[in-house]
């Protein structure tokens, strides 16, 4: 099976994400990018992480073409591949829907930086 290790990691961390209540049900998605192969292992669409197996994980190229897998890739595949195209050092994307983050988003209130390290991560949108 193509990208076996990456598939296993997507499943493992999907279960951890769900157990930590960072996402519920089938929400959220995880991908791992193998730059050497130019391929992405992406969680499948509409599956609970606790029932997902490595065989369910979809392998696609950076244009979204499914290379291996029988499942439909996450509907957020373009979000993941965009990160890998524009941030060459990125090797994984975790997109969650935690209750607290969703609540803050719905409130529409700004979230202030509370630690200097956040400034180190900022890059100008030039």
Language model features with spans:
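An anion-binding catalytic pocket shared by soluble metabolic enzymes
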Residues: 4-94, 101, 112
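Short active-site loop/helix that positions an aromatic residue
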Residues: 100-108
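Conserved small/polar residues in nucleotide/adenosyl-binding loops
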Residues: 122-126
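Ligand/cofactor pocket segment of small-molecule handling proteins
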Residues: 99, 111-120
């Amino acid at each position: 099976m193509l990208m076996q290790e990456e598939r296993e990691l997507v499943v493992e961390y999907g279960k951890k994400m769900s157990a930590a209540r960072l996402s519920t049900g089938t929400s959220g998605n995880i991908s791992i990018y193998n730059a050497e192969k130019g391929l992405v292992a992406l969680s499948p669409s509409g599956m609970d992480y606790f029932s997902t197996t490595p065989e369910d994980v979809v392998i696609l190229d950076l244009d979204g073409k499914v290379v291996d897998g029988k499942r439909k890739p996450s509907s957020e595949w373009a979000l993941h591949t965009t990160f890998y195209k524009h941030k060459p050092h990125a090797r994984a994307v975790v997109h969650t829907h935690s209750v607290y983050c969703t609540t803050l988003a719905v409130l529409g209130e700004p979230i202030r930086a509370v630690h200097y390290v956040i400034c180190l991560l900022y890059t100008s949108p030039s």
